Structure formats: C-alpha cells, structure tokens
C-alpha cells in the first residue's frame, strides 16, 4: 500500500481523504495557501507544506509548487480531490512521467473526457444516446444558425473544454443567437483557455441523473445512480439516491450501457457519467473523471467507501468489488451548505465562524472542515460543508434532513441552511415534481 499520500486540495474534501488514509495507516501531507494555514485539513494531516498565496493560480493550481511539495515530503501518491487540478490532464501526465501515483484517471482518459465533443463522440460510438446538435466545434455563425434552425430553438451553446455552467448560454430565439454565441466564446476562452463551443438541443424540463462507477483492469462496477436535479444556474444544491423518477427497466438499461462504455475505453478509477433525463429517455451529458462532491449519498446507501476504493484501484490496478457486492439500501439526501445569502441573490458571506454546532444522530453525517474561529475567505468555493441523511425510504430521509437542518447552527456567517429548510418542505420537492430549472423559474426565497 502507499506509504504517504499528498492531498492536492483543501477544505472538506481534503479532510475526507485524510480520514480515509488514517483508517488505512497511510501518512498524509496537506498543502495549503497562506490563508489556509490554520485550516482543518492542515491540522489533521501528518505533514503540511505552504505552496503559495491565496490566489488559486499561485497555490492550489500551481503545478511546480505542488511538485516541489511532493519531492520535499517524499510522497508516493497524490489525491487531487475535486476541482482545482483533479481533471487536469497535464498535471496527471507530469506525475506519470515522474513515476508518482495519481489517485484518479490516467492523463489519457482525463484528456479524452475533458474534451466534451470527443466525449460525446465516444459515448455515441459505445451505445449511449446523445443530445442532437453539432458534430464538433462550431466557429462559423452562419453555419451555426442553420444548425439551430434544423434542430429547433431553444438551443444550448456550450464550451468544449468547460463545465460547472461556465461558457454555457441558452438561446430561446434566433435574434439572440449572435450576441450569446459571442459571449459563450469569450467566457470559454476566459475560463478554459479555449474558445471552442458546440451547440445542442436544449431540454426545457430535464432531470439530472448520474451513474457512479468504479473501474479496475479486472472489472467495472456501477454504484447505481444519483439524482442531482435541484440546481441553481447549473450549480447543484441537493442530491439524492435513488432517483424518485426512474423505474427498474430504465435503470437496468442505463447501468448496462454506462458500464459497457467505461469498459470499452479501458477506464480505471472512480468516475461519474452524467445524463439528462426527460420523457422517459436519457441522454449522455459528460463524464467526470474524479470523485464528485455528492459521493457521500452513494456511500450511505451502498456502504462502500469511494475514497478508499479510489486509493485501492490506484495502488493495485484492480477493484476488489463485484457487481453482486453492490446492494443499495434505503434513501440518502445531501444538502450543500454554502456561505451565501440566498435572500440577497446568493451573495457570498465570508467571515469568522462563531458558535458552530453540527447535527449528529442516527444515519446523519456532516462532511466539513469548519469549526469555531474558522475564517471563511472569499477566495475559494463558497461551500463550507455537506449534510447527508439516510433513511429507510425517501420520506424518512427527508424527515431526518429536516431535523438535522433544524439542529445545525453556524454563527458569524450567513449560510444556505434556511434555503434548504424551505426546499425540503416545499410540495414540489416532497412530490419529486421538479426539474433542473425549478429554482431558476420559481421564487423560493
């Protein structure tokens, strides 16, 4: 087994990885920016190295500084978490060339799935339904307009190298197209260093469904699906498993096709294949070659530690799991707790946390890195922790989540806890009568 793992991340996911390593007796190295010196992940790790200033480009995205930290601490593996360099093919390639284990996908597969056009082509070749749209990148406006007329408005313009809702524009009518096309290209260049965009048919009322997989050279297994349809501006707020809208027949087809594609491309590690689902049909969206923020809901229903499985696959090249081992039980829900004021258009709320009481109890889990006196800075993602509740069924999971949200106290900053209370008690959520555009259309706060 690995002797020492460097965690190239911060916050709750760094703490989550350190906990998994500790259970296996693996030494850990935390890296941190100057403002994260007193953070929980730094306190919990066996060693820590400051890798730069608070700007992500100078620290958590600084590959030379990370490589120096790896050399300095003699780490034999790196876990990237999610975000930052977790899907950076160049970083994975540098580690491969230096014979340092990357606890994630190979640079080849990161690059393959990071190019959304290539990923769509591969998915289609391997039997997954894809969304109607351009065959590749689109540069000519006249050709783009013709394509839009063919598939019909509304359409979605997306950055080829993108994700997270950036470089993505919905065009409802032809008169808007030129302006939004230019804006999408500019955003794609700004966020991803590549202005290539592609066009797809826009679905008005879809659900967001994703399949968790674990793949070794010996076997590929799926850990069933997650429903991530409660979103605001393409950012997930609540995730759950199983999805309340899928039946067993659709699940079987979805899982078989997903496993087939992942097997065919020779993928290894943890991964998530995302789909949109509407009117009884699913369509490939993208594949994330890393652990997802929402992985705990899958862990709660399957009893499988996804982080440990990632580490084991990276070490041995194989997964110890068989599909018959995966027997989900009950229902799990996750709420992302962000340092934002939902009543003020989700304005960020940095500050120092005062009193902090985190809920506990039967089948209740908090993944976080906050404590009394912790400073929430404006430099990184606003999520401060995740609350996950498990029940025998969806009704019990909702009841447990409501109880846990009532118990959760974070003073000194404004959080999205009040928003989650409203969402969990809303009849649309209770009846599972919603889609990804629910919060963009309805006024909840």
Annotated model-derived regions:
Residues 133-134:
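Conserved beta3 strand of the protein kinase N-lobe
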Residues 141-143, 147, 206, 328:
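Catalytic core of soluble alpha/beta enzymes
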Residues 147-156:
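Acidic/histidine-enriched active-site and ligand-binding environments that engage anionic O-linkages
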């Amino acid at each position: 087994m690995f002797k020492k793992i460097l965690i190239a991340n911060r916050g709750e996911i760094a703490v989550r990885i350190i906990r998994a390593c500790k259970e296996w007796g693996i030494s850990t190295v935390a890296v941190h920016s100057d403002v994260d010196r007193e953070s929980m992940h730094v306190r919990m790790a066996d060693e820590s190295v400051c890798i730069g200033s608070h700007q992500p480009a100078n620290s958590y995205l600084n590959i030379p500084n990370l490589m120096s930290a790896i050399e300095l601490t003699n780490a034999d593996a790196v876990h990237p978490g999610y975000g930052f360099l977790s899907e950076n093919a160049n970083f994975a390639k540098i580690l491969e060339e230096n014979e340092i284990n990357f606890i994630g996908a190979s640079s080849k597969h990161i690059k393959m799935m990071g190019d959304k056009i290539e990923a769509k082509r591969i998915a289609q070749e391997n039997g997954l339904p894809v969304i109607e749209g351009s065959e590749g990148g689109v540069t000519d406006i006249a050709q783009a307009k013709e394509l839009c007329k063919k598939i019909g408005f509304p359409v979605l313009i997306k950055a080829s190298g993108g994700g997270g809702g950036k470089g993505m524009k919905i065009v409802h009518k032809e008169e808007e197209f030129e302006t939004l096309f230019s804006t999408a290209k500019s955003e794609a260049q700004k966020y991803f260093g590549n202005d290539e965009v592609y066009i797809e048919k826009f679905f008005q009322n879809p659900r967001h469904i994703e399949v968790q997989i674990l793949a070794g050279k010996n076997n590929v297994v799926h850990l069933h699906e997650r429903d991530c349809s409660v979103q605001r501006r393409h950012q997930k707020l609540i995730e759950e498993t199983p999805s309340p809208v899928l039946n067993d027949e659709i699940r079987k087809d979805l899982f078989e096709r997903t496993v087939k594609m992942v097997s065919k491309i020779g993928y290894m590690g943890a991964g998530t294949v995302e789909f949109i689902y509407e009117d009884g049909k699913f369509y490939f969206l993208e594949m994330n070659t890393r652990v997802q923020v929402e992985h705990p809901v899958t862990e709660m229903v399957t009893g499988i530690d996804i982080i440990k499985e990632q580490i084991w696959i990276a070490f041995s090249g194989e997964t110890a799991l068989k599909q018959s081992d995966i027997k989900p039980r009950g229902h799990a829900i996750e709420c992302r707790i962000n340092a934002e004021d939902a009543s003020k258009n989700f304005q960020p709320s940095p500050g120092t946390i005062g009193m902090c009481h985190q809920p506990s109890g039967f089948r209740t889990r908090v993944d976080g890195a906050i404590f009394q006196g912790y400073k929430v800075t404006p430099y990184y993602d606003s999520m401060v922790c995740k609350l996950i509740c498990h029940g025998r069924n969806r009704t019990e999971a909702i009841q447990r989540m409501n109880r846990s949200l009532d118990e959760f106290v974070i003073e000194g900053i404004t959080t999205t806890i009040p928003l989650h209370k409203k969402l969990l008690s809303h009849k649309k959520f209770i009846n599972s009568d919603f889609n990804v555009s629910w919060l963009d259309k309805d006024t909840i706060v």
